[in-house]
């Protein structure tokens, strides 16, 4: 009983002491040993949100790369009867017995594709003079070349059967119209979603080039579903029927994660479970839901977005949160707790899309709230941030790799909290480089700048240290309003992928184990009132690692980081630190296919067309990408 009384008394004294130290700051409270509330439990909100953003970005890069393909030769298969190319009608005759005939007037059927000026520029060459049948045929061929240059390969000019009398001649035009448009095999995608994006309307002039472009674009930007178009002669003369065949994967995915990227005060070891969908309500709307768990923290999250236009503009809602309690360390008796939330309503819109270049815009309205409670007298501090942000995201493919760049402008409005009134500028860059022979380089960098020396809620500060930033240090040990981060990593095979046994080649460990060497560096600069150590601003480390594909669907990233700079914020100093992440992502689609009793239909093999001299896709083999992100842990 006496021990319990002494313990409670000690808690009360420590709590009152903490309150006294909090008077001069509405957020940070220090004891004589330099203890900060936000760095122990409050920062879990920022720490976990940052980790989720890192995962989201890695997943974006992975999906973007894996979906990048050159146009398939059979994206559009033409099964209609083909014309021989001879548009001369042998029934054309002339009254004169000579080899030439006078043409005074040429009548051409109305066209929805070619303008009168374009047609007149061709037929004017044979009007008002004697011409041969060959010259008339040449004019017809010129019109067909004009059709071909526009991509309308189903349109053609021809000479109908006629007798040339009085110098008058008629050139006929056939401009095929779209007939019936049907979609097959789309269990998880609405028919209207597909037909809205192939751009072919019934009774409109059929454009095969536009159709192929639409099909390739659809396959490029819609994960888990691909289209193939078959063309057939329409049931109505002068029309082309389009049959869209859909191949879909099961749209729901499960991912389990375990790592040691948690904070020491709430538990280094974390577990997580995530469910995400590629087409929740059959409109290619994406949903992610899940949570991370550690000894002292729970971090649930939810994200949902839906396409709102044919150019893949998306509106979405994001919710992330952290409920944390300090359970480890010298200050666990203070009963420190934190509750953090972030709500975002966002809109993303591709602005430019080319095979080797993409520019996207992103805008969002955010509401963030964080509350820290401690002590048995329930003392608390609360921060609220209402903000708006706008960003541009760029992807540029080069001969040996890909660039990703981001630039964001952010403003916090003083609506709910007068202190929250500031601008924030941030950006990032990533370079993936293929050195060939299985050697891949990855460069990453980001920065954040908040002008002035005002108090900034920790929810909008930048932090560094740990698995996703500077390896070799504890997770999230540094935080400040300004900062930067740089990392370089080289990923390479450490063993051969195949070995020869006798006359046969067998798979070897190089297929499942990759080596890695890295160097990380960061600088974090807090405002002067929060600069406890006045100069301990930098982190730097080097290290090595392994990326392993375990049997089944289990993958892992293992790193050993060695600090090069002794940082005073690092209370648990180690010469080297081990980081790991294990991810279990079962391929549900493959499992369902194994259980399926449906008859497997073998498609007729179509001979591929020769590749162009300068193929757009520099990475047709997606295994290149596995060297970068062979851990599919990013579910967002």
Task: Enumerate the language-model features and the residues they cover.
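C-terminal outer-membrane beta-barrel translocator/porin domains of Gram-negative envelope proteins
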Residues: 373, 378-515, 519-521, 525-527, ...
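Gram-negative/organellar outer-membrane beta-barrel architecture
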Residues: 29-33, 191-192, 207-401, 563, ...
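Surface-exposed coil loops of outer-membrane beta-barrel proteins
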Residues: 190-200, 271, 325-332, 336-338, ...
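Transmembrane beta-barrel strands of outer-membrane/channel proteins
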Residues: 231, 256-260, 273, 289-293, ...
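C-terminal structured "cap/appendage" subdomains that terminate the fold
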Residues: 535-556, 563-568
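Periplasmic polypeptide-binding modules associated with outer-membrane biogenesis and secretion
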Residues: 29-262, 274, 290-299, 445-447
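Gram-negative bacterial Sec-dependent N-terminal signal peptides
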Residues: 2-27
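Hydrophobic core residues within well-ordered beta-strands of beta-rich domains
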Residues: 271, 343, 359, 388, ...
